[in-house]
């Protein structure tokens, strides 16, 4: 029996059939030229992705089948951590069996998730690594279909690219056929302008660089390029030098994102020769990812809005308050309004039936007379058995109005006639809340004597004791705690009265509440204690009393920040000193890994750096991605901060996770004085990071002649190769910066010879 012709052409490439997989094939992606199914292998119990070409029927032409097989064979040979693995071909149906990527394509993720900056940068960097690998193959393998749909993400959101096989299509198609086919495949936006302008030129590596730039734009903005434009409009715009809008680019983005935008612009340059190669791109994306990962997130100070009733007083001296007047004016009975306004002047205060009715806004004569402060007239009206607890449309009872207006006689009169001391308005405020807000201990005592709930909580959970603590009314607070008010009740965000008193720095209230059993370390929802709030606001006396009373100086909030972290980040020298005296830890890390010294270095607080150093803080403490305080200072701080840390004993040669030393960062940032300072403290000029770059490589890449001269004088060698055999000399030549070129020509006569041999030729594809 003759062998299957397909098998004859497969060589060592494994062949699968539908029977090798379980019956349930799940469609996970579909495009104009292919469908991707998820299927489980029967024996291996492993999930695979099977990319089928619905345009190729079972009796497809042998050339089409051969193309698919050739493509699979080519892809299977390529082994790299950021390129999807190929396991073989499927005969029935015809397709390629490949590694299953749990999170699907970047295209799908961008449309359904908001990605953090760190993840966006990592995807950009890993994509550049994959493309650099393809371009470094001999001969270079061009992708020619780089787009979010072909950037796949595994279960940990790491990148693997697929579908780098369009070169055959291009060889077999006319330019117009290729463009039309690209439009159908949804990749027109990723085609560079030279493809529209130069009819005979074959695509080169810079084609992929342009496509990569559009991918960067999509990742940064999470939008679709050229949305709303038809095929011809896109071609015309791109050919004319126009690109996706930069309007979404925001000044609020981190500085590293602004630098990524600069890289993106260079990658989509109209002139292919001016676009960087992927080797250079990986250098920049690695730098930017490393810098972004070291960013310090200091929790923002959240102002505590002063709690007040949302209602204005219904009575103003000598006249009817505007609110109550407006409610009366809004009534649908103008005649009644006139009668009601005359009540205070009438000797006969017995109202007619129509005057006792409730109107649209539910304001009654009793509300009006209470707002007027007319005790005797209210007494006469109450004698006619009116509803003493009648409520306006906003829930106001006469007693609430009297309490808000600080009318103790009216409150007593209304309570004597059975007014409910716990009836609340629409915001949940009881009369006792108003008395506490006003510091009216007389009315508060009267209300409590008539059954007012001492721990009544309004809609957002505030009690009268919270309000007394906020407004520094010790008289009311003492009355409330004498009536067993609970000092540990939490409002909606978790604040106790002690949180409120500490935030506003009301020392007398802090002392009173702590003496009455308030929990010193009670936590809000964000886990902040009263001490956190007092430190954040700089309330020294409140801090002092809390610490004396036994508050824990190292309590951590939801970001892992203790009071000392906050004080160090905000430059509160005296508070730092006080916290250290009460035993605050110098080495507690936040969730990002930052110690108080990291934060002081990041913010540039020199006094606090010296204080922490004198207190024996670890100058080499490792934070996020193993950055020391000196790394943060070299990257973000002023030269004086770098100098202070070095004087205090910081190690100038500490290497972070990717091998970057403070000298690398100072060179990358072009801070000349920091470079000098680090070298004077014996920074290693030959230090190499994980990809083999020395500080001299970075100086050459940045085109900074002054710093490169200093490094050379300190012994830097210009012929040291990095991980891809590139020297600072070669980077300098490729940067084409005149100052660097002039310096090198004078410093190193052999540069001309090196230039003649095209030092970057093996990388510049």
UniProtKB/Swiss-Prot annotation:
Catalytic activity entry: L-seryl-[protein] + ATP = O-phospho-L-seryl-[protein] + ADP + H(+); L-threonyl-[protein] + ATP = O-phospho-L-threonyl-[protein] + ADP + H(+)
Alphabetically ordered keywords of this record: ANK repeat, ATP-binding, Kinase, Nucleotide-binding, Repeat, Serine/threonine-protein kinase, Transferase
Residues holding ATP: 28-36, 51
Domain Protein kinase: 22-289
EC number: 2.7.11.1
GO BP term, pick one: cellular response to retinoic acid
UniProt cross-references to SMART domains, sorted A to Z: ANK, S_TKc
Tissue note: Highly expressed in brain and weakly expressed in placenta and spinal cord.
GO molecular function terms listed in the Swiss-Prot or TrEMBL record: ATP binding; protein serine kinase activity; protein serine/threonine kinase activity
Listed result of changing residue 736 to L: In a lung squamous cell carcinoma sample; somatic mutation
PROSITE patterns referenced in this protein's UniProt entry, alphabetically: ANK_REP_REGION (PS50297), ANK_REPEAT (PS50088), PROTEIN_KINASE_DOM (PS50011), PROTEIN_KINASE_ST (PS00108)
Official protein name in the record: Ankyrin repeat and protein kinase domain-containing protein 1
């Amino acid at each position: 029996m003759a062998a299957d012709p397909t098998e004859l052409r497969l060589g060592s490439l494994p062949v699968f059939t539908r029977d090798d997989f379980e019956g349930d094939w799940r469609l996970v992606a579909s495009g104009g030229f292919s469908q991707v199914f998820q299927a489980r292998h029967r024996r291996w119990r492993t999930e695979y992705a099977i990319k089928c070409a619905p345009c190729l029927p079972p009796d497809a032409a042998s050339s089409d089948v051969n193309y698919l097989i050739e493509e699979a064979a080519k892809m299977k040979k390529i082994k790299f951590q950021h390129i999807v693995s190929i396991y073989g071909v499927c005969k029935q149906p015809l397709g390629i069996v490949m590694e299953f990527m749990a999170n699907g394509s970047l295209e799908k993720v961008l449309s359904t998730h908001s990605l953090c900056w760190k993840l966006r940068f990592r995807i950009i960097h890993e994509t550049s690594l994959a493309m650099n690998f393809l371009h470094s193959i001999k001969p270079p393998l061009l992708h020619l279909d780089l787009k979010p749909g072909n950037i796949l993400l595994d279960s940990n959101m790491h990148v693997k690219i697929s579908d780098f096989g369009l070169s055959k299509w291009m060889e077999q198609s006319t330019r117009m056929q290729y463009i039309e086919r690209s439009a159908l495949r949804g990749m027109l936006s990723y085609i560079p302008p030279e493809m529209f302008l130069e009819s005979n030129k074959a695509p080169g590596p810079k084609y992929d660089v342009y496509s990569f730039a559009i991918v960067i734009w999509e990742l940064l903005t999470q939008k679709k390029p050229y949305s709303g434009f038809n095929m011809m409009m896109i071609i015309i715009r791109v050919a004319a030098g126009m690109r996706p809008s930069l309007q979404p680019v925001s000044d609020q983005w981190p500085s590293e994102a602004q630098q990524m935008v600069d890289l993106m612009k260079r990658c989509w340059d109209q002139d292919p020769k001016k676009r960087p190669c992927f080797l250079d791109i990986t250098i920049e994306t690695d730098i930017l990812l490393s810098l972004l990962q070291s960013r310090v997130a200091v929790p923002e100070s959240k102002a505590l809005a002063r709690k007040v009733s949302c209602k204005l007083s219904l009575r103003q001296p000598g006249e009817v308050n505007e609110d109550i007047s407006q409610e009366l004016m809004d009534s649908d009975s103008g005649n009644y309004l006139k009668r009601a306004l005359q009540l205070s002047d009438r000797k006969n205060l017995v109202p007619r039936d129509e005057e006792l009715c409730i109107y649209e806004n539910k304001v009654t004569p009793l509300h009006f007379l209470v707002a007027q402060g007319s005790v005797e007239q209210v007494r006469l009206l109450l004698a006619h058995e009116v509803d003493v607890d009648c409520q306006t449309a906003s829930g106001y009872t006469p007693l609430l109005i009297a309490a808000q207006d600080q009318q103790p006689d009216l409150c007593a009169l209304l309570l004597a006639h059975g007014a409910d001391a716990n009836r609340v308005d629409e915001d949940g405020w009881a009369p006792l809340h108003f008395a506490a807000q006003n510091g009216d201990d007389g009315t508060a005592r009267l209300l409590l004597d008539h059954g007012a709930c001492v721990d009544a909580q309004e809609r957002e959970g505030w009690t009268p004791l919270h309000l007394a603590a906020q407004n520094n009314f010790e008289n009311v607070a003492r009355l409330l705690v004498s009536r067993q008010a609970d000092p540990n009740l939490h409002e909606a965000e978790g604040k106790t009265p002690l949180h409120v008193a500490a935030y506003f720095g009301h020392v007398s209230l802090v002392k009173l509440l702590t003496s009455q059993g308030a929990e010193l370390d009670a936590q809000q929802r964000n886990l902040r204690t009263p001490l956190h709030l007092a430190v954040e606001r700089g309330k020294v006396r409140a801090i002092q009393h809390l610490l004396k009373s036994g508050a824990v100086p190292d309590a951590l909030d939801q970001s892992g920040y203790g009071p000392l972290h906050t004080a160090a980040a905000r430059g509160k020298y005296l508070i730092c000193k006080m916290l250290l005296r009460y035993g605050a830890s110098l080495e507690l890390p936040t969730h990002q890994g930052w110690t108080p010294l990291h934060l002081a270095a990041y913010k540039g607080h020199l006094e606090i750096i010296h204080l922490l150093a004198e207190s024996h803080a670890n100058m080499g403490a490792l934070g996020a991605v193993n950055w020391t305080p000196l790394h943060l200072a070299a990257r973000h701080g002023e030269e004086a901060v770098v100098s202070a840390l070095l004087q205090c004993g910081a190690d100038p040669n500490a290497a972070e996770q990717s091998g970057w030393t403070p000298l690398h960062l100072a060179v990358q940032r072009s801070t000349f004085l920091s470079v000098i300072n680090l070298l004077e403290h014996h920074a290693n000029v030959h230090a190499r990071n994980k990809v083999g770059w020395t500080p001299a490589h970075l100086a050459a890449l940045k085109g900074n002649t002054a710093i490169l001269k200093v490094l050379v004088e300190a012994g830097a060698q210009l012929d040291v190769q990095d991980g891809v055999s590139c020297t600072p000399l070669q980077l300098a030549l490729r940067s084409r910066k005149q100052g660097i070129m002039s310096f090198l020509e004078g410093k190193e006569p052999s540069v001309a010879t090196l230039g003649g041999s095209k030092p970057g030729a093996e990388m510049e594809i």
